[in-house]
Amino acid sequence: MTTLLADPVAQVIATAEELLSKRAGATVTLAEPEDLGGSGPAIVLRVRAVQNPFALPKSMVIKQVPEGGSEAAVLREVVSYQFANSLTAKHRPGPELVAYSIAERLIVLTDLGSAPTMSELLAERNRAAINHALMAWAQALGRMHVATVGREGDFAALLRRIDVKKTDVDPSQQRIGGAETIDPLQQILRSEYALEVPPALISRLQQTAELFGKGGVRAFSPSEVAPDNILVTEHGVRILDYEWGGFRDIVLDIAHALTVYPEFLGAAEREEVAELDDAMTEAWRSDVVSIAPGLADDETLARRVLDARLMWVWLATHEYFTVDVDLDDDTVAFGNPAPSHAALLGRWVALHAAAERVGDPVVAGHATDVIAALRGESLMED
């Protein structure tokens, strides 16, 4: 990470200084900016407060989304941090919100330090470190779910309090949604590969898609977070991306983690995915069974998780085929770009293996068909 002096960075710092000075009632001076990267066009900096009232942290992180980015994402991220601030440190999934300005599209957060990311730990060929990191991720999700179940009304109230007049921010809408992808992807699979999706599978997809917006055991979720947006600190797992935080069925979160983590592993470690999947799922269940007693049944758990994984792979497939066409919609703004051909194929292969382990011939058969189609396809763009 390098110290930055570029004008856009200076402007972000000046804006943050003004915001923090108003909040503290005294002059705040920030220095030594470090570029932390960021999703899309966002500027994310670590700064040190060299002139600092006692109440502010000595080191903070500033995030600003430039004009042209999704206003809804900024609003939802602010509300997600406000909501998370109400949780105890043990249950809070990420940094604390220090200050924000909707008008300036700027957020100031506590600094979590320079801990390794989940993706960096998964890339290490150290089975013990990988196992520890994945279990910490699963347990962090479980603790967060238990601490926030039943509080969707509080989150919705925070959204309403911001009083946005020109941006539609539905409290339940974290992404375009699974239901809207079912018919289009059916048509794509039919036209591109002459592949028909079994009606029984469509019914299951429709039922699972509803869980983004209603039903199920609903708790707070930072939304679909990639391993490179997760820090593994000495205090546990901390999630960095809240752009589409909200409430949804808890199974969707563990299923998303199971869907994305294997592509960050080395080839040898991928041979142990079945064991890692089971261990993660069990670590998560040990916490959430208190709020979702039905998941104590192994068959129920396996079916629910498999259906949710199917939904995530279906969504990724839809994004793979459509994201380059629909750059003006919110698909790109959700922070997870369309997967590469190799990553998408890997997700279908993993889904097939999971379906085989569960003994689900419908999902396994469909996955086999899609895998064959993708393997016969020329690479679109890696």
Where are the regions a protein language model picked out?
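Active-site catalytic-loop/activation-segment of kinase and kinase-like phosphoryl-transfer enzymes
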Residues: 1-12, 156-209, 353-359
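Juxta-kinase regulatory segment immediately upstream of eukaryotic protein kinase catalytic domains
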Residues: 1-35
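Conserved short submotifs of the Hanks-type protein kinase catalytic core
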Residues: 104-116
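Short beta-strand micro-motifs within the conserved protein kinase catalytic domain, predominantly
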Residues: 96-105
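Active-site activation/catalytic loop segments of kinase-like enzymes and analogous catalytic loops
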Residues: 252-293, 307-328
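Conserved kinase catalytic-core helix
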Residues: 115-158, 204-205, 211
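ATP/Mg2+ or Mg2+-diphosphate-binding catalytic cores
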Residues: 309-382
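ATP-binding glycine-rich loop module of kinase domains
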Residues: 41, 45-74, 120-123
